[in-house]
């Protein structure tokens, strides 16, 4: 039996909005598998669509470079927001971004090796760990970029107006689509959601045959919600992004979205533990 920690229960609660006891029970039944617990809670009606995993806990910056139909995003992490604003840290991050832009296709491993000496020297000087975490490249006829406070970076590739594609990049930053078009949603993702929706309908008392028919409409809504062109446009929710693009004679072929610290969790201590640590006592 997997250990059900308080932090795991809290994460499930944050992602589902369900009560603490319901979350703990679901985790016990799923043997600590949070994704399985979410699926089971959705099937039983205890939770609706869950928030995506990947609480942002690390600090750092996202930098972008765009030129002549080519763009690159680089993420560099550190431990505190204070260091994320340090001139030395930002200087190194900009060097990395410039190098990645000038050497298209450089892998993250190659980037890390290229700047390891400078990184180690800066760590020794500042006294805080830092690392070059991710690099992502995008090609296209037109590349638009959007940076939200150096914490979220988006590149959008397409054809048409750069100004209109930048609006779409802002939408991607806010709405986090996973695919470009509804038809791009992978068969595996669609089938997983379909089975959940069928179980939800059956658990509500519907016969299996009727449940399966009901699900088709729900699946169309689901693929629209997770795809860029199917989402309601943040700047005008009365139209979809797809309709907006058609109205301005612009199209999107691909996009990349990076957010500082996605998928990284810092070690957290409760307040009592922090006090005990400071005073040398026990919590």
Swiss-Prot record:
The record's listing under InterPro entries reads: EF-Ts_dimer_sf (IPR036402), Transl_elong_EFTs/EF1B (IPR001816), Transl_elong_EFTs/EF1B_dimer (IPR014039), Transl_elong_Ts_CS (IPR018101), UBA-like_sf (IPR009060)
Q: Does the keyword Transit peptide apply?
A: no
Q: Which SUPFAM superfamilies match?
A: Elongation factor Ts (EF-Ts), dimerisation domain, UBA-like
Per the record, the major location class is cytoplasm
Instruction: Tell where it localizes.
Output: Cytoplasm
**Molecular function, one GO term:** translation elongation factor activity
What family name appears in the similarity comment? Belongs to the EF-Ts family.
UniProt xrefs under NCBIfam families? tsf (TIGR00116)
Q: What does this protein do?
A: Associates with the EF-Tu.GDP complex and induces the exchange of GDP to GTP. It remains bound to the aminoacyl-tRNA.EF-Tu.GTP complex up to the GTP hydrolysis stage on the ribosome.
Q: What is this protein called?
A: Elongation factor Ts
Lineage of origin: Bacteria, Pseudomonadati, Pseudomonadota, Gammaproteobacteria, Pasteurellales
